[in-house]
């Protein structure tokens, strides 16, 4: 029986490349001179440090630009509020969301069931397996999921006949 998996996985090598590019831009930009702006990774968190709340927000925007250029969705990142630190520093905590949480998985299953397609969806630890009798039904299910505006970035893998 044909099937495929729906997952939400972050490519950490692309994130590292985007961090390097953003760090380079932050070190070269005039408005960040003397502001000690930097980006650090502590999986599953990313920290952005700078002197001043506005500089932290600007550094986050630079990082977002670099992520989008490398085709990494910003839906993986949840930014907190800039927190003041010692000596006028500020830091911003970015929480990385990988996998499909239970709420979004149920929304996808409901979306598939409401579409009246002859496919079944099963939730399995951060991913979904969708099975059907015909390959065409599975392709329609993929199109249906892509058309929905979900708050998570999805990939479709392991398409099997």
Residue ranges of model-derived segments:
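Short amphipathic beta-strand starts and helix->beta connectors
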Residues: 23, 27-36, 76-80, 105-117
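Short, hydrophobic beta-strand segments
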Residues: 2-9, 44-49, 87-96
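An alpha-helical, amphipathic repeat domain used for nucleic-acid recognition
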Residues: 13, 40-43, 53, 159
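Helix-adjacent hinge/juxtasegments
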Residues: 56-97
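Positively charged, low-complexity, intrinsically disordered RNA-binding extensions
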Residues: 93-95, 99-161
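Short glycine/threonine-rich beta-strand-turn micro-motifs
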Residues: 42-53, 124-134
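N-terminal, positively charged regions that mediate nucleic acid binding
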Residues: 1-27, 31-34
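A structural signal for short hydrophobic beta-strand segments in well-ordered beta-sheet cores
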Residues: 38-39, 121
């Amino acid at each position: 029986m044909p099937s495929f998996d729906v997952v939400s996985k972050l490519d950490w090598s692309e994130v590292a490349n985007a961090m390097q590019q953003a760090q380079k831009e932050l070190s070269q930009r005039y408005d960040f001179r003397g502001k000690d702006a930097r980006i650090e990774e502590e999986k599953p968190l990313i920290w952005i440090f700078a002197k001043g709340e506005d500089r932290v927000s600007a550094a986050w925007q630079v990082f977002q630009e670099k992520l989008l250029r490398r085709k990494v969705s910003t839906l993986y990142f949840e930014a907190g509020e800039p927190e003041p630190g010692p000596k006028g520093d500020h830091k911003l905590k970015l929480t990385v969301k990988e996998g499909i949480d239970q709420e979004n998985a149920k929304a996808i299953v409901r979306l598939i069931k409401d579409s009246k397609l002859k496919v079944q969806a099963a939730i399995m630890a951060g991913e979904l397996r969708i099975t059907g009798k015909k390959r065409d039904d599975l392709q329609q299910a993929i199109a249906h999921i892509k058309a929905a505006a979900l708050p998570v970035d999805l990939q479709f893998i392991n398409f099997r006949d």
